[in-house]
Amino acid sequence: MTPKKMSKLDSNKYSKMKAELKHPISYQKICQIKDAAINTIGYSSEAIEYALKTSLTTYLFIDNEIEKLENKISELYLSLDYKIHTIKGIGILTAAGIASEIGNFDAFITRNQILAYAGLEPSKNDSGEHNGNGKMVKHGSAYLRNYLMNAAETFRVYNPSISDFYWKKRNEGKHHRVALSHVARKLVNVIFTLEKHKVDFNPNLVK
């Protein structure tokens, strides 16, 4: 919408526009934009207006396709017997991403195998012992590692005991990403337990 058209926007046109928007703008905000449009020094161009309309149409189409794809992913995930989404702070799309990367949990005998697959196990020094600095080896599935690290952020926010654990690591002098990798390992432990025993998440059992 050009400044010229914006300056002529009335309450009826606003109501129509509001109905078409996924995230409506308040009428007060519209009035502020309208006042700014009235005082804008510029010119009206049909070419620019057409380009804006085309860009908006493309954006809305892509946004709608993404929404349909996300709905399909959620539908497929929920049709399977995964328990990852029951963890407080982890949404269905994130859970679906983790599940898609791990696949069949029966293929993993121990949780350490999942840590290794995600490249989240601690690195070792030349003697073959864990060096204790919390650094990840970063081999394995980068996608799974990213899903788990991102999920670890909300996992610590929504679970007080995990938040305490995170800050304990920070107070030990570890940087955010290192402390978060420790949280991600705890998250893998929780996921492994839920999927192996097919039980829902119980925040009271998280330590």
What are these regions (language model features)?
Residues 1-207:
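A detector of single, family-specific signature residues
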